[in-house]
Amino acid sequence: MDKENSKQTAQPPVVDPARLKQLNLAIETLEKQFGKGSIMRLGDDSAVMHVKAISTGSMALDYALGVGGFPRGRVTEIYGPESSGKTTLALHAIAEAQKEGGIAALVDAEHAFDPTYARKLGVDINSLLVSQPESGEQALSIVETLVRSGAVDIVVVDSVAALVPQAELEGEMGDSVVGLQARLMSQALRKLTGAISKSSSVCIFINQLRDKIGVMYGSPETTTGGKALKFYSSVRLDIRRIAQIKDGEEVVGNRTKVKVVKNKVAPPFKIAEFDILYGEGISVLGELIDLAVEFGIIKKAGAWFSYGSEKLGQGRENVKRLLKEDETVRNTIRQQVRDTLTGTPTE
């Protein structure tokens, strides 16, 4: 018993003062050579322990990521099949960053940016920095310059598959270009990751899927650009359409599932589902209703929805219209959902 108590009350070992002096001298030398903050104790106030983030525009996905959105100072990869919502999700993140007063940049390697659609998602296109580079080297050089400036909060590259190496552009159609893009990405990410970490920028790479030839077991799907992006990404999101949303016979959107397949800032493998409506983006009200029903904040009996003693309406679309008009009820429900997601006790 005495031994157990002594173990519990044992003090950390005292470091030899001579060794401590030598360590402090070494730290001073490193800070003179490489700048203050090049090495620090994690217990110091100056050491950043909390990961800051920019919201994804989806409450469910913010929660699934564990830190409230896309982590700052990290590389994020969003990949999935065509028309699954990759660019839509990235544009929502840009809009959220701008709402907080941040500066956003889009490197449009696909040359397919639609300003009208971006505006509908809430993006301030007047302040958005857009570049449409001619080659992969130019695109990644632009990203590096923006990140190193320390003034940009979020940079989106759309997409990795469209980053064409200069050598491929200068060659003839049909020339063998095996491994050029993978080498380009590997070299660029080695330089970028440190700069992104120091600048606290969110850097999102949108990627496409390809099928590997001759795969007998396991998934034949792979992403473009080699393996470097998989390694350097702190977060990887797999986004898929799982169902169509119809208004009568007309398809008006898609039910979307996002799986966090890699996460170095929180536990991975969490899943978020939400609606993406054509011309509108993520259905914020639809997601709010789904989460509120899941958490028992809104009660559903048949087609009827009720909140407390108040009936909200019959059918999900009618409830969405009511919440759109009634700001007080909407904000109250949203706060309760947020409190449930974060584990904050509701008063």
Curated annotation (Swiss-Prot):
Domain of life: Bacteria
Transmembrane domains' residue ranges: none
GO cellular component, one term: cytosol
Keyword tags: ATP-binding, Cytoplasm, DNA damage, DNA recombination, DNA repair, DNA-binding, Nucleotide-binding, SOS response
S-S pairs: none
Residue positions binding ATP: 80-87
Similarity annotation: Belongs to the RecA family.
Cited function: Can catalyze the hydrolysis of ATP in the presence of single-stranded DNA, the ATP-dependent uptake of single-stranded DNA by duplex DNA, and the ATP-dependent hybridization of homologous single-stranded DNAs. It interacts with LexA causing its activation and leading to its autocatalytic cleavage.
Protein name: Protein RecA
Organism: Chlorobaculum parvum (strain DSM 263 / NCIMB 8327)
Gene for this chain: recA
